[in-house]
Amino acid sequence: MTKKAANAEQAVRIAAGKSIEASLQNTFAVGGVLIDNRSGTALCALHNNVLEDFENSKLFLLHDPTAHGERQIVDWYFKNRKRLNLPDPGKLSVITTLDPCAMCAGALLTAGFNVGVSAIDNYAGINYNEAFDFPSVPSRWRSVAQSSFAYYGVEAPIRRAYRGGKRVAFAKQTISAFTFCLTGTIFESSVNSVRALDNNSGQDPSKLTNPKNLPRNSTVRKALLDAYPEAFSVTCPKPRLPGTEIARALLNTAKKAHRRGAAFNSVAFLDPFGNLLLCLGGAEERSPIRTAFMEVTRAYAHTRWVLMNHRDKSVREQAGNVLTHPKYGTFVSLYSPDPNTPQGLMTMGAYGSTMEGPIPETFPSNLQYVLLPEGVSQADVSEMAMGLPPFYTTSVQVAPSQVLDEGLIEETRSSL
């Protein structure tokens, strides 16, 4: 990019331009820009891509539940950091049209960027209560958020005072009431319809057929095996009650991830029939926010997106008859999200963005874990979930829980 911003107004307007592009794409109307604090240079500007056309096809739009502008900017930075000789994250600011959600706030804190914000999101934003105390952020990270996040002042007739840290690009500055209102209203005009389309993008399991019974030459079956070569190798008789049958997959995947420099963790995804469709580790060696959960939810969404837009109608119909929204499946992680870290906040937020609304069956939870990180209790994990912004606690009702099968817990623990 060659654009430069001389002040907060110009920076937010660059991001606002991206939010307009997002609105025209019929996805969440949010945009962001990565600014070099010293020069004001716009290094990267991206908008939300949760819903996106597939090669001009509009048949199925749910592309990536984690493709919020801020998350994409973080991954863009780590992908291009060496090639472009980019400054350290602490010398850069992500300027966003909307208060980051839990996932994006966790991603930004993990990466170490400064953050400048225009509009508030009282439902899913990390500063939802507008008190600047960040109750959803792990306690030891709240002071970090208070020094690295900023909410620009707004001129008359809004008259909002600047609140935030001094390290953010264009600290202490204001933006126009016009720009502030644009960034808020354009998001509000899109949010409910996008959430509804996402949350309802799949059939009830009672109307599905088991993908395990697909013929070997099925395009859908091949796509699932391409995403995870061991798909269908394990079946849990009761998908919400996973047992020892998934222990080996979780452990082996975590070990492989760790050997290449990622965290020792893995996440399995079981479909409504109990089939193990995915079990992936993270890619933190590439980007610190590419955790195992992020990799799994993105892989499942991408596979559906490609298949549901396939040029062959019979493939599309078959995909729609065997694959559905992940709210009907079960995510099982080897280790729970760590409530003491921003990665933990990000993971719970990403789960909320994956569900994007109510879950039909809330018990047992469809967000489960086998083991707890050292020094973390089940109560700690639940406390973080209950402290998330209202969208996550009232609509999604995020409720991570430990698997109920003691044999699975013991087998994995004894194999470490």
Task: Tell me what each language-model feature is.
Residues 1-416:
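Zinc-dependent deaminase catalytic domain
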